[in-house]
Amino acid sequence: MSSGGLLLLLGLLTLWEVLTPVSSKDRPKFCELLPDTGSCEDFTGAFHYSTRDRECIEFIYGGCGGNANNFKTLEECESTCAA
């Protein structure tokens, strides 16, 4: 295979890796935790990954405490946990 062909193959494999969604086996374990509002009362919207619904869902977060299945943006939740 020529060097141009190898570069093209490497580029395609890299693109595939970037665009392939997170699979359940690659998903961090904390994505399986239930949403936890935490112990404070500075309520704001946050997102958690729902294993039941298989998507990121908004919930009310108290501003402190809670667990790792807590994201400020939908995009952050999806890129970390969503399949």
From Swiss-Prot:
GO terms for cellular component: extracellular space. The keyword Secreted applies. SUPFAM superfamilies: BPTI-like. Residues 1-24 form the signal peptide. Keywords: Disulfide bond, Protease inhibitor, Secreted, Serine protease inhibitor, Signal. Disulfide bonds join C31-C81, C40-C64, C56-C77. Expressed by the venom gland. It holds the Pfam family Kunitz_BPTI. Residues 31-81 form the BPTI/Kunitz inhibitor domain. Its main location: secreted. InterPro entries: Kunitz_BPTI (IPR002223), Kunitz_BPTI_sf (IPR036880), Prtase_inh_Kunz-CS (IPR020901), TFPI/VKTCI-like (IPR050098). GO terms for molecular function: serine-type endopeptidase inhibitor activity. The keyword tRNA processing does not apply. It is found in: Secreted. Belongs to the venom Kunitz-type family. Serine protease inhibitor. This is Kunitz-type serine protease inhibitor textilinin-7. It comes from Pseudonaja textilis textilis (Eastern brown snake).
